[in-house]
From Swiss-Prot:
It comes from the Eukaryota. The keyword Ribonucleoprotein applies. One of its GO terms (biological process) is response to cycloheximide. Keywords: Antibiotic resistance, Cycloheximide resistance, Ribonucleoprotein, Ribosomal protein. Confers resistance to cycloheximide, an inhibitor of polypeptide elongation. GO terms for cellular component: ribonucleoprotein complex; ribosome. This is Large ribosomal subunit protein eL42. One of its GO terms (molecular function) is structural constituent of ribosome. InterPro entries: Ribosomal_eL44 (IPR000552), Ribosomal_LSU_eL42 (IPR053708), Ribosomal_zn-bd (IPR011332). It comes from Candida tropicalis. Belongs to the eukaryotic ribosomal protein eL42 family.
Amino acid sequence: MVNIPKTRNTYCKGKGCRKHTIHKVTQYKAGRASLFAQGKRRYDRKQSGYGGQTKQVFHKKAKTTKKIVLKLECTVCKTKKQLPLKRCKHIELGGEKKQKGQALQF
C-alpha cells in the first residue's frame, strides 16, 4: 500500500512560475479510446462482414500491476505535469499517516 499526500511542493516549469510551488496531486486515468483512430477504423472495417475474428486476441498477460502515474497541477498557474512512480498494487491519496505498532488496513 502506497500512501501519497494530496499536495506536493515541487518545481513548476510553467511560464508564470519557474519555481517551486504547491501542486495538487491526483491519479492519472486513461481517457476513453477514440473510435476514429486509424487502427480502430482499420480493425472495424476488417471485422465487418463474415469471417469471424480476424486478428489475434492477446491472452499471455505478463504483468500483475501497472505503474502509478500522478497528475500534478500547479495551484498558481494551473500547469499540469505527470510523474510516473514504481509499480504497486494499492495506492491511497491523502490517507492517514502510519502510527507506530498499528496493523495495516485495506
